[in-house]
Amino acid sequence: MAVEKKFVQDGYVKASMDEYFAKQLSRAGYGGMDINRTPMGTQITVYAEKPGMVIGKAGKVIRKLTRDVDRLYDLDNPQIDAQEVKRPELNAQMMASRLASSIERGWYFRKAGHNTMRAVMNAGALGCEIVISGKLTGSRSRVEKMVNGYIKHAGKPVDDIVDDGFATAVKKLGTLGCKVRIIHPDAVLPDSYRLKNAEELGSLVSTPVEEEKSAGIEELVEVEAKGEVAEAEEAVVEETAKAEAETVEETVEEVAASEVEADMITGESVTEEGEERREVNGVWQHKHGGHDYWHPTGRMHRES
């Protein structure tokens, strides 16, 4: 079987089974069903206002339902479980059945519809819509719609948060269709929002600001500490450079003095031919032969 036909077949089986349960369990307050296919078989959960009537005396009714489902719909090892609906006013199928029953008993359709809507909204529903169609008054068919609260009509939220129910009321003039749509109190609407109060905003805003302030102070302290360390290192480097420069200058002066002394000693010990010597203010000078000027003996002679 193709995938498309498989989906169509599954939908047909579920719709037919829902109609069968609604007909067989009308007195028990039938409120819908779920089908879950597992490796152990097919699990069918039936929701009802009176689950005891679904089970029956010694399980007689539920065994009969299981045999009929297996015979009519050819399911794999069907197992039926009955669950009680705690709040029938929030179950769309139950309210549709009640509305149809009220109309069949002779209630005016508008009164029955408003009473049903009032019960649904008093139970805490976010929205409710009731549509009654058929020969309401007169010989022509028409549609009567009643809406209260918030209702979605299209899109994915319709499948997620809107509960649908449908039932028929048989009158002398014809059949009336009763459709009920309910949005439960715990449903999350797609356009819902909530304003935060001042305390929540204060807690959300103050904490990051305080953290930023403390972080900023810590950063400033770290920067100042790094600056002080850098200044101290620079001062140590400058002092070391000055000390090295002074040491180099002293070494140069000592070397120059030693060279001068060595030159003087050399000059005193070596005397050239035709050279004249004299002492002026403690400085020895000499004059070479053939020259008319005197100069210190420690001066280097330029070779000619």
Swiss-Prot record:
Domain KH type-2: 17-86
UniProt keyword Transmembrane helix, yes or no: no
Coiled coil: none
Gene Ontology biological-process entries: translation
Gene Ontology MF terms: rRNA binding; structural constituent of ribosome
Function, as annotated: Binds the lower part of the 30S subunit head.
Protein name: Small ribosomal subunit protein uS3
Species name: Methanococcoides burtonii (strain DSM 6242 / NBRC 107633 / OCM 468 / ACE-M)
Taxonomic lineage of the native organism: Archaea, Methanobacteriati, Methanobacteriota, Stenosarchaea group, Methanomicrobia
